[in-house]
Amino acid sequence: MVHRLIRRQFLPAPIEQVWDYFATPANLNEMTPPDLNFEIIHGGEARMYAGQIIEYRVQFLPGIRSLWLTEIAHVVEGRYFVDEQRLGPYRFWYHEHLFEPDEGGVWMTDRVTYALPFGLLGELTHALWV
């Protein structure tokens, strides 16, 4: 089954500052919840660009680390970018990051379309943890 998660938040900063922060893959360490033990292995050194491959490890369950390889598939400077999983824990992963300047800051919207592996077991896991 394919799932969709949408989150929107207002960031009280200019679009240039917000975009610069999110367009720097090294900042993923700060954005990711600490319990995931997120670690960039390769590809996070340069500013984000279409076609960029980023390899990292994450820990979804205690003691179980997973390799995750994503590609920055689309970028429109200052407006949006999309990362797609190429290898990793999900059966499918498509993550849109949208930025809309507004008075006093920026509305940022995350739209994640994803599917878990393992069929029924994956769906039970989704019901318990997501």
Please annotate each region the language model reported.
Residues 30, 39-87, 103, 107:
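Glycine-rich portal/gate segments that line the openings of hydrophobic small-molecule binding cavities
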Residues 17, 30, 64-66, 93, ...:
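Short acidic, gly/pro-rich beta-turn/loop elements at beta-sheet edges
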